């Protein structure tokens, strides 16, 4: 099976039992563990640790969709990933038995510096931002969007099409049926907001006064503060605040 590696990049370490199908593009410095299966079209960045028994690029769970023998044949999808496929960034840790499905109308996407624990799953057409943690057995339905710095606890289930806001903390065993607000703490079945993720905000470099100024916005009772937020956080929350109305 063939795979591409960026010229001049660090070598990839791929276990001999791993299967990489046609249309899999690798950056450099990736580790791919035993019995992992990656089928194209898939583009993976640099420095990822992909453990044993991981599956990336298998078909989306659509009963009427095609299920090709992609580990033997060249992919039938768009090799430019303009519509479907999988795109994974850099420096992610993807633990054993995790899975990422192909997209059907857009690429299923995982950003940079994420940690996917054992048995977590990213469904077709899902978008996961940067620095996201999916704990053991977290299941993301198709078309979901998890924004950067979110943390989903063990066994959380996210209904297809749901949105998890930036910096949100979702408690273990939660069933998310609709949108979860930015930097909220959410728990239960159905999941409901129970507070503000103060720890997450402090880790983003906010002092007590700035957290206090931002809290009304987090609770949906005020506007974003005009200043005081670090540039990267300001960009993130402004993008969330300006998301299309149908995502509210």
Residue locations for each model-derived region?
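Short, low-complexity, intrinsically disordered N-terminal peptides in bacterial proteins
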Residues: 1-11, 246-248
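Structural signal for interior beta-strand "rungs" in well-ordered beta-sheet cores
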Residues: 7-192
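Conserved beta-strand-loop-alpha-helix hinge in the C-terminal portion
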Residues: 184-206
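Interhelical loop and adjacent transmembrane-helix boundary motif
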Residues: 218-221
């Amino acid at each position: 099976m063939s795979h591409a590696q960026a010229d001049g990049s660090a070598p990839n370490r791929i276990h001999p039992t791993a299967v990489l199908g046609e249309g899999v593009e690798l950056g450099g410095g990736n580790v791919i563990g035993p019995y992992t299966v990656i089928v194209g079209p898939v583009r993976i960045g640099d420095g990822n640790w992909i453990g044993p028994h991981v599956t990336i690029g298998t078909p989306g769970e659509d009963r009427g969709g095609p299920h090709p023998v992609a580990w033997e044949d060249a992919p039938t999808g768009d090799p430019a990933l303009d519509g479907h496929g999988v795109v994974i960034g850099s420096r992610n840790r993807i633990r054993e038995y995790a899975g990422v499905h192909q997209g059907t109308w857009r690429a299923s996407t995982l950003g940079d510096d994420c940690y996917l624990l054992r048995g977590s799953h990213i469904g077709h057409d899902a978008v996961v931002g940067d620095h996201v943690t999916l704990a053991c057995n977290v299941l993301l339905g198709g078309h979901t969007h998890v924004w950067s710095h979110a943390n989903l606890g063990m066994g959380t289930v996210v209904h297809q099409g749901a949105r998890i806001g930036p910096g949100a903390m979702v408690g273990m065993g939660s069933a998310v049926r609709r949108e979860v607000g930015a930097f909220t703490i959410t728990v239960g079945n159905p999941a409901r907001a129970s507070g503000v993720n103060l720890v997450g905000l402090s880790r983003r470099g906010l002092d007590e006064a700035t957290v206090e100024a931002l809290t009304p916005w987090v609770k949906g009772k005020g506007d974003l503060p005009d200043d005081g937020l670090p540039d990267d956080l300001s960009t993130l929350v402004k993008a969330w605040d300006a998301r299309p109305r149908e995502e509210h």
